[in-house]
């Protein structure tokens, strides 16, 4: 190689290295089935989360964070695409055995599961868009949309459907519970190759099975609380320990200053004394299902603040893309928060939206078929409307079609329905919901007359 070629190679390689260094690494941490109250930094009197406490203290912390749909797969698909469930068509965890879905499969020659997964091909994904911008990426933990490659990740753990066990993570579900080696190896390789990386860390924690290490369980059974509750509390601390390991590795590699770390939960979970979860938590449109703290941490770039504004998980994708200098293909419904995270200025938004559907999808091409609730929060007030979608195998369904209006500041448990006393506010907030979108074929204020079978109810306990 002559001197000119050596010079050109060095120049090009040097420019690429500078390009890589200017792009932040991105770490998205997703906990699984955890209440917004169940952290030390959120005021829980018993659960210890020292590593998340430290992260929150170094971050922009949104205590009023929300996911628009409080169920595993829809929540994760929103984080993968930046879109609402009614936009990306992943409204539930699995396709239901319905005439509509049978008709779709007969026409296409594909299974309903495959047709559902194909939505990730149609709308694209955060990993794909970041890949177009020069990122390498790794999937670990929960992932429903086929293999990690199909999700646009360059590396990963999940084999996915139609592989055996490939419903929602298979080998990926080992991360955290069985160590952190795959994640650490990916980080080490990315740093050695001088490539910016995106890490999807979605451990199956504190999700069931609640089988924490005995050393943690002993801490929480000592006070005489019910065993099911003690196990859940210990699982929350176990999750925290894995996050501590991850953050230590990032610090030890000397890349913390150039790494944007984001934390969010897929949905809430209020632990019942005898096992399982309470009604107004996972799957529900209430605070116990949809609310969770959202954290953005990037030392020297994101201003440390305890932020009072509303935040939604829909903001995460556009914010990540902006930080990475990558343009996505959609007009995302969420906000790019990066300018306000850097400046510390107030986010000029006081309204966010959400929707809840049946656990199983009645019509994989029509999201409204399974629509059960829509909600809007404006300031401190929340309006919740019911709809007459097919409940399928829902564990809990609405008992009434009455509008529900709550003052979340005065009544965070949503016990006092103010709708009858404030018809004008109900009307105003209903108008906002219909400006958001009108669900064709569904009627607000009604509930489905269809009953789920005993077999379906047992399946989803």
Positions of the model-derived regions?
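Bacterial Sec-dependent N-terminal signal peptides
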Residues: 1-22
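C-terminal cap/loop subdomain of S1 sulfatases and analogous C-terminal strand-loop tails that border
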Residues: 17, 269-274, 302, 309, ...
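Active-site His/acidic residue clusters
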Residues: 183-232, 267-279, 424
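Beta-strand elements within well-structured catalytic alpha/beta cores of enzymes
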Residues: 23-35, 54-55, 79, 130, ...
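Active-site segment of extracytoplasmic enzymes that catalyze sulfate/phosphate-ester chemistry
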Residues: 28-29, 35-124, 135, 148-163, ...
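Histidine-centered active-site microenvironments of extracellular/periplasmic hydrolases
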Residues: 47, 151, 248-305, 311-312, ...
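Long, internal low-complexity/basic segments
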Residues: 21-24, 31, 35-36, 61, ...
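A short beta-strand-to-alpha-helix junction
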Residues: 45-48, 66-71, 95-98, 115-124, ...
